[in-house]
Amino acid sequence: MKKIFQLSFTVFIIFISLVLGVVGNVQQKRSNRCIDFPVNPKTGLCVLKDCESVCKKTSKGLEGICWKFNAKGKDPKQCKCCGLWPPLY
């Protein structure tokens, strides 16, 4: 009885290790990165609400960030969508 339990436990541990390894590989393939998106062509500035809206339309898990401010810390010139993206093949 003890050997059957020991064998079953060993097989269970090996199975769990393999499953965790596969899940880890899948999650690792998604990478956190930012991609630039165009800003309002009329003003040439990034509006946070518009930037967030574009990013949400692109993919659910992305966050919009206005970037590249002038020397006074105002007038952002770039919209970036950051988050987990699927792998590039």
UniProtKB/Swiss-Prot annotation:
<feature type="disulfide bond">
    <location>
        <begin position="34"/>
        <end position="82"/>
    </location>
</feature>
<dbReference type="GO" id="GO:0005576">
    <property type="term" value="C:extracellular region"/>
</dbReference>
<protein>
    <recommendedName>
        <fullName>Defensin-like protein 147</fullName>
    </recommendedName>
</protein>
<keyword id="KW-0611">Plant defense</keyword>
<keyword id="KW-0295">Fungicide</keyword>
<feature type="disulfide bond">
    <location>
        <begin position="55"/>
        <end position="81"/>
    </location>
</feature>
<dbReference type="GO" id="GO:0031640">
    <property type="term" value="P:killing of cells of another organism"/>
</dbReference>
<keyword id="KW-0732">Signal</keyword>
<dbReference type="InterPro" id="IPR010851">
    <property type="entry name" value="DEFL"/>
</dbReference>
<feature type="disulfide bond">
    <location>
        <begin position="46"/>
        <end position="66"/>
    </location>
</feature>
<dbReference type="GO" id="GO:0050832">
    <property type="term" value="P:defense response to fungus"/>
</dbReference>
<keyword id="KW-0964">Secreted</keyword>
<keyword id="KW-0929">Antimicrobial</keyword>
<comment type="similarity">
    <text>Belongs to the DEFL family.</text>
</comment>
<feature type="signal peptide">
    <location>
        <begin position="1"/>
        <end position="24"/>
    </location>
</feature>
<keyword id="KW-1015">Disulfide bond</keyword>
<feature type="disulfide bond">
    <location>
        <begin position="51"/>
        <end position="79"/>
    </location>
</feature>
<dbReference type="Pfam" id="PF07333">
    <property type="entry name" value="SLR1-BP"/>
</dbReference>
